[in-house]
């Protein structure tokens, strides 16, 4: 596994709306110490971002788009990722219309498989990012089991999210081990209990309740290529949150 910890820019989405803000964000992330990133949540063109990323020594390892964009603009996704020098084309999540039934899960798989195959022909990979709904059961089987078993392991990879695995009732480390190298990237996202009503929420890595020693070991054993810090909801300045997570993980042996 790449020991350089990554920054998921979705955490910083409010700070990547303009090219000027994007440059400031890249500078701050570089100053924290991050060397790899995921591009997500920004409307900016790859051609405009790439020189800035290069200036601050930031390597893009994955991106995120919604499924409708994959369906309608696959050539653009291929061009976008190639411009950024990034081989993993991430899907942010299954569209709502596919989440309602076993039949619709099958329809998503039927539509996603040829997209993943086309990306592989272009030298890229399709990466499915999980939430918790994939652990709904239809007909006695998880949606996730169908995503694993009815897709091509050579084409259809996963961007595993530790927080959403825990919310879905899964052990993140055990799930990563089960996935092996199909888990091409992992979002390191912690979970803490917000209040006495037992409301779960996201936290800086190391500030919550997940077992990070076991998760990190699982990533190493499974052959995960990249680990990226993500925190959709921050309760302080998001750059401070990103630094806290970075400091925790560098103490665990990341760079």
Which sequence ranges carry the predicted segments?
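N-terminal pre-domain/capping segments
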Residues: 1-87, 181, 254-255
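Conserved, mostly hydrophobic/aromatic
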Residues: 7, 29, 37, 53, ...
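Active-site beta-loop-alpha junctions enriched in small/polar residues
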Residues: 8-12, 40-42, 64-68, 94-96, ...
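Charged helix-capping and loop-helix junction motifs
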Residues: 20-24, 74-75, 104-112, 140-145, ...
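Active-site acidic/histidine proton-transfer and metal-coordination neighborhood
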Residues: 47, 55-59, 67-158, 167, ...
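Acidic/histidine-rich catalytic cores of soluble enzymes
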Residues: 121-209, 216-218
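H/E-rich (His + Asp/Glu) clusters that bind or coordinate divalent metals
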Residues: 208-216, 222-230
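C-terminal helical cap(s) of enzyme catalytic domains, especially alpha/beta-barrels
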Residues: 237-255
């Amino acid at each position: 596994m790449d020991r350089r910890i990554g920054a998921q820019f979705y955490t910083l989405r409010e700070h990547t709306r303009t090219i000027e803000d994007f440059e400031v964000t890249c500078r701050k992330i570089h100053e924290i110490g991050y060397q790899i990133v995921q591009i997500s949540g920004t409307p900016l063109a790859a051609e405009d971002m790439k020189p800035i990323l290069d200036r601050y020594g930031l390597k893009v390892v994955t991106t995120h788009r919604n499924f409708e964009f994959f369906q309608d603009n696959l050539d653009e996704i291929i061009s976008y990722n190639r411009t950024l020098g990034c081989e993993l084309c991430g899907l942010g999540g299954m569209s709502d219309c596919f989440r309602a039934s076993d039949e619709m899960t099958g329809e998503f798989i039927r539509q996603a498989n040829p997209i993943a195959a086309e990306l592989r022909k272009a030298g890229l990979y399709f990466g499915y990012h999980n939430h918790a709904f994939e652990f709904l059961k239809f007909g006695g089987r998880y949606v996730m089991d169908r995503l694993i078993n009815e897709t091509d392991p050579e084409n259809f990879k996963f961007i595993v999210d530790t927080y959403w695995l825990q919310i879905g009732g899964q052990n993140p480390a055990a799930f990563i081990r089960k996935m092996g190298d199909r888990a091409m990237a992992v979002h390191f996202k912690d979970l803490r209990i917000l209040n006495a009503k037992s409301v779960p929420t996201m936290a800086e890595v190391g500030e919550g309740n997940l077992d990070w020693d076991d998760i990190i070991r699982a990533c190493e054993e499974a052959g995960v290529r990249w680990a990226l810090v993500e925190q959709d909801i921050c309760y302080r300045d998001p750059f401070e949150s990103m630094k806290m997570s970075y400091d925790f993980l560098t103490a665990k042996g990341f760079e």
